[in-house]
Amino acid sequence: MPELPEVETVRRGLEQKLKNFIIKRVEICRESTVAYPIDKIDFIEGLQNSLLYKWNRRGKYLIAELKKTVSNNNDANEISFVENGVLVVHLRMTGYFTFNNTLTNPCKHTRIRLFDNNNNELRYIDVRSFGQMWWVRDGLSPNNIIKGLGTLGPEPFSESFNVNYLKKVISNKTRSIKSILLDQTIIAGIGNIYADESLYSAGISPFREARTINKNEIKRLRRAVVDVLKKSIGAGGTTFSDFRDLEGENGNFGLQTNVYRRTGKKCRQCKNLIERQKISGRSTHWCRKCQK
């Protein structure tokens, strides 16, 4: 599943590529991709004539601010804009966007197509079809409509994600520290890859009970989370299967991982072999010698 760095990479690509992109036509190729509104006609009509004004990210969600075009009754050439809510996207396991400036037939796994006046197309592709989209009209709160969005913990790059916050939320937790990092209600955006890499960088065993992590270790962990995520964003994220950026390019952070998917290979630091074991059903990669 695309995690924070991959979603941030997509957000930056969309923001750069789709300047002045006004949706003139919406084509739904798979109805289940549209999670809200229930009536798909409302989704189509809600997006039509909307400018994709600004792209934001919250955890693993992409959020596009929309502005509706409104013609002046006295002058057809004069167009103004009014707020039109947001388009929210969750890529889930295999979702990604492509931008096409020539008309082409949709590929097999195309789910949603958005066209502008010049027939430029923003195409959403999703092999496993778990990804979802929501159009939330102006005046309604996406947090109240989209399950999971309103319960997200702080962003790793925010001031709220600090040592005191981490100390407070893990102080009485008997769960493993790895499970804590994966809990989106505690920290938004971290998945399996970056939980493993952050714990390795901090020198903390993923199997430790969260409440046993001392203050110095919390400081190291917070710093590791931020550093690892920034490094991955700089590399365009990680591609191990389906993730692509808007230009169809793979992320390059996978070449730089220290433990993730390096089972049986030598630790880059101590030369011990990297091990793999499951925690709460999730594959966990770690170095027994470097992580205590």
UniProtKB/Swiss-Prot annotation:
Originating organism: Prochlorococcus marinus subsp. pastoris (strain CCMP1986 / NIES-2087 / MED4)
UniProt binding sites for DNA: 109, 128, 173
The protein's role, per its UniProt record: Involved in base excision repair of DNA damaged by oxidation or by mutagenic agents. Acts as a DNA glycosylase that recognizes and removes damaged bases. Has a preference for oxidized purines, such as 7,8-dihydro-8-oxoguanine (8-oxoG). Has AP (apurinic/apyrimidinic) lyase activity and introduces nicks in the DNA strand. Cleaves the DNA backbone by beta-delta elimination to generate a single-strand break at the site of the removed base with both 3'- and 5'-phosphates.
HAMAP family: Fapy_DNA_glycosyl
Organism classification: Bacteria, Bacillati, Cyanobacteriota, Cyanophyceae, Synechococcales
Designated gene of the protein: mutM
UniProt xrefs under Gene3D superfamilies: 1.10.8.50, MutM-like, N-terminal
Residues in FPG-type zinc fingers: 258-292
Keyword Transcription regulation: no
Cofactor note: Binds 1 zinc ion per subunit.
List of catalytic residues: 2 (schiff-base intermediate with dna), 3 (proton donor), 60 (proton donor), 282 (proton donor)
Name of the protein in question: Formamidopyrimidine-DNA glycosylase
Disulfide topology: none
SMART domains in the cross-refs: Fapy_DNA_glyco, H2TH
